[in-house]
Amino acid sequence: MWSRSASFILDKRQQPPLDHDQKKLTPPIKMADALQNPKNPTSPSNISAYYQTRAEHHAVVSSDWLAQAQAAVLGETPETHRRSVRDGGGKPFSVIEEFNYWRKKPDLAEAVAAIMALAAVIRCSEATTMMELEIELTEASNTLKSWDTTSISLSAGCDLFMRYVTRTSALEHEDIFSAKSRLIERGERFGEISLKARKTIAMLSQDFIFDGCTILVHGYSRVVLEVLKTAAAGGKNFKVCCTEGRPDRTGLRFSKEMATLDVPVKLLIDSAVAYTMDEVDMVFVGADGVVESGGIINMMGTYQIALVAHSMDKPVYVAAESYKFARLYPLDQKDLSPALRPIDFGVPIPSKVEVEKSARDYTPPQYLTLLFTDLGVLTPSVVSDELIQLYL
């Protein structure tokens, strides 16, 4: 698969822009609908847990993708992804507590944290039939989804795990203990695949980063960071421009990472994007979700950066793991469930002044050039075609 991807990359550098009918690589994964609306008593009413965690958003993978990705892991089994459920001294098991334990790990995606928490539910379950186990998992899944109703990844991770429980016919012919063991193994394996996906994306993107180029980055994406770390480790000379990313100033954090790597970096105020775009060769962004249209949901400001880049004929590259593909089809910005964040202007704001607090926006596919995923290099139209076919 990777040799095909490499050929695709080299052709891109010598030929006109990609045709929408470019031959596809392995089909993207599918995802169940996200953003359910149960009441959430554990999060602040005005600030979403999405903003508080700043976690990446993920979706559902197929069993074929799991088999393919497992082979790519090359035997790596990080100890940080294996954990026995706490004895608790008789304390009732809490799926939210287990989820929070995994969510706090810096390199673990939020969807994988949900998978690990649901795997722990299986370990603690005293169910004697698959039906009883499914009921317990459904209740735990709904509890996790209600923790933050705006999180695409959280809902997707729960849907992923439930998919394996309800759609795997092989488990019907096994005793409950064997079935539990197999489901637990799948959850742990998915955690390993999550880390491997970023390394694969970093490898695929290297042919697009050339010596002397200037890259504009918006937000703090762990995938984009891995891409640039790999390029720097490979001896490539490039410069990075980071937007400040107000109000949470993710650009400051990203610029510090670049400085640690001895990569020349310039920090921009958000309003200086158009001013600086003329000296930029490409734009690299991550994604909280890749939707059916081929567009992306990402940190607020991504849309306007893509608009400026498009008007000045600069390529916009998206680095996103394939399990972020979401079965969503926003038509405009208002179709997104708001993920609110606190904003401090440094001065008192009159009560009559309305403040926009949304943390993310939607970028349509026509403003994106390519998506780098662990399945290969995809055009936005390929994402759209595959997701539509998967859910017909």
Predicted regions and their residues:
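Conserved phosphate- and dinucleotide-binding cores of soluble alpha/beta proteins
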Residues: W2-R4, D11-R13, P27-V60, W65, ...
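Nucleotide donor/acceptor-binding cores
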Residues: G212-C213, F238
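Intrinsic-disorder-associated, low-complexity terminal segments enriched in Asp/Asn/His/Tyr and depleted
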Residues: D11, D19-D21
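Long amphipathic alpha-helical segments
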Residues: L35-S181
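Gly/Ser/Thr-rich loops at beta-strand to alpha-helix junctions
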Residues: T214-L225, P247
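Predominant activation on well-ordered alpha-helical scaffold segments within soluble catalytic domains
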Residues: I96, V112-A119, T138-S141, S155-M162, ...
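A short, well-structured juxtamembrane/interface segment
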Residues: I193-F210
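Glycine-rich phosphate-binding "P-loop"
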Residues: E174-A197
